[in-house]
Amino acid sequence: MPDRTAAPSYPFVYLASQSPRRRELLDQLGVRYALLAPTPDEDAEALEAELPGEAPDHYVLRVCVAKAEAARARLVASGKPAAPVLVADTTVTLDGAILGKPADAADALAMLARLAGRTHDVLTALAVIDATGELMPPALSRSAVRFAPATRDALARYVETGEPFGKAGAYAIQGRAAEFVERIDGSHSGIMGLPLFEAAALLRAAHVAF
């Protein structure tokens, strides 16, 4: 195992995500980053497939680590300078079921109808592979979100905005879905997709300077 006490520091991290929210959150921390997006020949969606009977926390951690390993391989193949790689993955769970990204408007509306008037969990996993290629112990942020009761018409109007698409659980807490959020217990940044407390700890352990 590398001696981290003697490791050099790195002025930036590779962010393997296309999420503008995660970029904004890294900006909030003052972390410099370079994007490391999947190449056109990579099947990123295949990594998100659920295994039969898989628990939500196991699922999100497994997917996050798989994405981190794919990103590290992409970095090595690119010949770019060595630096740590950061990956995050978020899922929503209700009654033990995983609510991923909606397939279409009907799917989004069905998800939101399930969440209305209920408390669900938002799980965000973080994985960092350091500059030597070692996977650091992943982190998991768990937050509870309470949705107020909402009419089907109100939910349908929200779906029509297009905001639910590409979002786990079919909503973005930092967007117009805030009108449905009665309360949260946990990490607001984690619900957005990058828990900053855990991210800062992992990045400092990987010797990212910020």
From Swiss-Prot:
The places in or outside the cell where this protein is found are:
Cytoplasm
Principal location class:
cytoplasm
Annotated active site: D89
Q: Which reaction does it catalyse?
A: dTTP + H2O = dTMP + diphosphate + H(+); UTP + H2O = UMP + diphosphate + H(+)
Q: Where is this site: Important for substrate specificity?
A: R21, T90, Q174
The reply to whether GTP-binding figures as a keyword in the UniProt entry is no
Q: What is its EC number?
A: 3.6.1.9
Extract the CDD domains matched here.
Maf
Q: Which domain of life is it from?
A: Bacteria
Cofactor(s) the protein requires to work: a divalent metal cation
Give the GO cellular component terms, alphabetically.
cytoplasm
Q: Which GO terms describe its molecular function?
A: dTTP diphosphatase activity; UTP diphosphatase activity
EC supergroup of this enzyme: hydrolase
Q: Name one Pfam family in it.
A: Maf
Q: Which family does it belong to?
A: Belongs to the Maf family. YhdE subfamily.
Name of protein: dTTP/UTP pyrophosphatase
Look up and give the organism this protein is from: Burkholderia thailandensis (strain ATCC 700388 / DSM 13276 / CCUG 48851 / CIP 106301 / E264)
Q: What is the lineage of its organism?
A: Bacteria, Pseudomonadati, Pseudomonadota, Betaproteobacteria, Burkholderiales
